[in-house]
Regions:
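N-terminal cap/leader regions of alpha/beta-hydrolase-fold enzymes
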Residues: 1-233
Length: 233
């Protein structure tokens, strides 16, 4: 459970031991690799994974943003690019490979903007399974990525989506559009919807939107999904 830098100087938070059977990449929300994201990585480590959370805002000094400071979070998000994110994902998976974790051993999970990133990562062929918690960009692409509707047929690994019906930024209609488009993918896909879930329902630090029942179930669904889809050693 430490912060460190990869050989190329890229900062990450890591939890767990390198003799774990599998690794999980944890992709941050718009608020940085903060206490919540670190705690998520710790939970995966407690479940037996080597967890790593890359600092996607590292080009801006790896800031942590207050939950009530939306404008600042949006500013840092606006600085993200498809090229930069791809480089960061590749640096992370290449580091994991040096520890013995090949693509089939690696899961990726992302929250909010990180959910969009984890969906994109599932098209690269560098991870074995992916999960998205309320990731946007379904109809309109973000960070230079195509919309998720366009990326859906290109998925190269199993993907799990976890969405809340009360999410004001991601209407249920869009989620169901995505479900329909995912039928074109050549891999297993699954969407779980939570009737009482708002955007950010998994984050216990955001008390106004946190839903304990949905959060616990969604985390367990992710563990179960990775247990099935990642390579057996």
């Amino acid at each position: 459970m430490t912060e460190q830098k990869l050989p190329n100087g890229f900062p990450v938070y890591v939890a767990g031991t390198t003799d774990a059977h599998h690794a999980v990449i944890v992709i941050q929300e718009a608020f940085g690799v903060n206490a919540h994201i670190r705690s998520v990585a710790d939970r995966f480590a407690e479940a037996g994974y080597f967890a790593i959370a890359p600092e996607l805002f590292h080009r801006d000094g790896s800031p942590e943003v207050d939950y009530d400071d939306g404008p600042t979070a949006m500013k840092y998000m606006a600085n993200l690019t498809m090229e930069g994110i791809t480089n960061d994902l590749n640096a992370t998976t290449e580091f994991l490979a040096t520890l013995g974790f090949v693509a089939a051993d690696v899961g990726i999970v992302g929250y909010c903007m990180g959910g969009t990133v984890s969906f994109y990562a599932a098209t690269l062929g560098t991870v074995g399974a992916a999960a998205t918690f309320y990731g946007g960009g379904i109809e309109t692409g973000r960070f230079g990525f195509p919309p998720l509707l366009e990326l859906a047929p290109e998925l190269k690994c199993p993907w799990l989506g976890l969405y809340g019906d009360l999410d004001q930024g991601i209407p249920v209609e869009q989620v169901e559009q995505l479900r329909a488009e995912l039928a074109k993918a050549k891999v297993r896909t699954e969407i779980v919807r939570y009737a009482e879930g708002q955007h950010g329902f998994h984050c216990e630090a955001r008390r106004a939107v946190y839903n304990e029942a949905a959060a616990v179930d969604a985390h367990q669904c992710t563990l179960d999904f990775f247990d099935v889809e990642l390579s057996v050693k």
